[in-house]
Structure formats: C-alpha cells, structure tokens
Amino acid sequence: MQFTIFTHLTMALSYAVPILIAVAFLTLVERKVLSYMQARKGPNIVGPFGLLQPVADGVKLFIKEPVRPTTSSPILFIATPILALLLAITIWIPLPLPFSLTDLNLGLLFLLSMSSLAVYSILWSGWASNSKYALIGALRAVAQTISYEVTLAIILLSVIMLSGNYTLNTLATTQEPLYLIFSTWPLAMMWYISTLAETNRAPFDLTEGESELVSGFNVEYAAGPFALFFLAEYANIMLMNTLTAILFLNPSSLNLPSELFPLILATKTLLLSSGFLWVRASYPRFRYDQLMHLLWKNFLPLTLALCLWHTSLPISYAGIPPHL
C-alpha cells in the first residue's frame, strides 16, 4: 500500500516538476526576448548569461513576508493562488507527451472543464481582496476568459469532428498523412489568437495591465501568493501552446521513436511561445470594446460556420462510393 502511494506521488512529481522548471525559464526567455527587441541586454548578472535569474526571483518572492489586507477574507485570499496553480498543473494530465499520465476517454472535455474552473480562482481572488479595484479587474478578467472559451470550445468541436474521437492520442493518428493546420488554417489562426486572449497575454492583457497603476485582480497580492499566480499564468501559456502543437502540428508517434516525440513537441511549443512574446513586444493593448467585438462579431460567426462545415465533411465523404 505504502509503495503504491509512493509510486503515484513520484509519478505526479515527475510530471509537475519539469513543467514548473520550464515555466521558470520561460520567464527568463521572455525577458531576454523583450530586452533584445528593445535594444538592451536584459538579465545578465545572476549566473552565466543570467541563467540563474529565475531562481533568484523565486527565492526573493518566497522569502518575503506575505502582506494581507486587514479587511480581506483570510482563507479565500490564500486559497485562490494555490487553486490557480493546482488547476494549471492538473490540466496537463491527459496530454500525450507522448504518453499521458492518465489516458482519459474524454480528454478534450476534461481540458475545457479544467480551464473553465480556472475562472473561479480569478473571481474569488478579486472578491477575497475586498478591494473595489481588484473586484472590477476580476469581473473584467472573467468576462474576457468566459467569452473566448466559447470560441475555443467550438474550434475543439470542429477538430473532434475531423479526428473522430475525444481522446488526444487519436490526433496523432489523424495527422499522420498531413498536419491539421493545412486543412483547417482559419481555425488554427483563430485558435491561436483566442489562446492569447484566454491566457491574458498582450494585446489582450486587460486582466493584468502591468503598465497601469492598478494592475488588475491581483493588485493586493505580494510575495508567495503573487508568485503562485505568476507560475499559474505561465503554466497556462505553456499548456495552450503545447495543446496547439498537439491539435494542429502533432508529430505522429507512429513514425517517430518515442524518445524524439517530446523533443519535437517541445521545439514546436517553444516556437509558438516565442510567437506570444513577439506579439507582446510588438502590439499595443486592445480597448475592451474592441476585444469583445472581435469575439462576438467576428470569431463566433466564423467558427460556427466552420464547425457546420467540418461536421458535414465526414457525412459527405461517407456517402461517396469507394471507387471515386
């Protein structure tokens, strides 16, 4: 019994720790990319080429005294950052890298439901702070996240229609002859832009305007709890880019040795994440009405039409005689 518990704990840790290490170094990559795009050097003091900067930042944040507003809800104020990071790590469970921790039959639905639950951590953190600025920021963030989840769900449904299964492992078999990005490129473009909005990245970073005096829902957070929110945000960025690679650029595990699969997937994830950083360095922030107009007036009708199109394709092909 004890051995079984130890094995399960080791498996969970071996899954979570590499994600957290990757997240830590993604922050360094972001700072380096932004600095070079602004013609400056970026972090280069702590360690060789600044490689130990994420470690120094983490140590500094976690040894600081966590300041809590006197009027806040104490339990919920501390619980929400923990919940945010827990959900950000848990959502990786069904991803085939090339083997998933748990091969779920409804893996894509699990991803959708877990990403929807992440909204509660934002809402509760804004409410628990007992600050009107934090609450307004949280409500704005929740509205943005829920809105763009509609598009993501419809795009996922279209991909499911083409792959014929809710499991993520099937996508490797589906994309063996051709990547789905070639046959569904309008969906892939809208998916990528929607993931930018879903993860609250520039130019959709209305949730957490770092250049503003009041940054958003996490304005009252400092030290350790703030670091947990930060880790959760970057873990979600890594997750969304890994999911994009699996959905539209999946290297087929049937033709590759299992050792090469994670390397190729990680390379594609890094390139997609670099796109996120490039966009942040290049584009100004959207106005809130433009953000909502883009989704409800542009993306939603397009994704609904394409979903109907992709639903009709398998039915149409099933009616074609085999000799044609």
From Swiss-Prot:
One of its GO terms (molecular function) is NADH dehydrogenase (ubiquinone) activity. It is found in: Mitochondrion inner membrane. The gene is MT-ND1. One of its GO terms (cellular component) is mitochondrial inner membrane. The chain crosses the membrane at residues 9-29, 75-95, 106-126, 142-162, 177-197, 228-248, 259-279, 300-320. This is NADH-ubiquinone oxidoreductase chain 1. Belongs to the complex I subunit 1 family. It is a multi-pass membrane protein. It comes from Struthio camelus.
